[in-house]
Amino acid sequence: GDIIENPTNDNIGSATLVYISAAGSATEAILEKADGSALIGRIKMASGQSITLVKEATDKITCPNSSCTPIAYHW
C-alpha cells in the first residue's frame, strides 16, 4: 500500500498490519478505537526505529515524525 507520512487519526487504509518507521527524531505511535472512545496503546520509538503493529481494520493511528505502510488486510 501507499506510505502515509505523519498520520493523525488514520486507519492506514483499513490495514490490519502496519509497518511504522520513525523518521528523523523520536516519536510515539498512538493507537485508538475508531470512534475515539478508547486508547488501545502507546509505543515510544527512537529515531530510526521501526515496528510492525497489528490492529483492527478500523483502529486509528497517530504517529508524528513517521512513515506508516499498510502491509496486510485481514477481514
Regions flagged by a language model, labelled:
Residues 1-75:
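Surface-exposed, low-hydrophobicity beta-strand/loop segments enriched in small/polar/acidic residues
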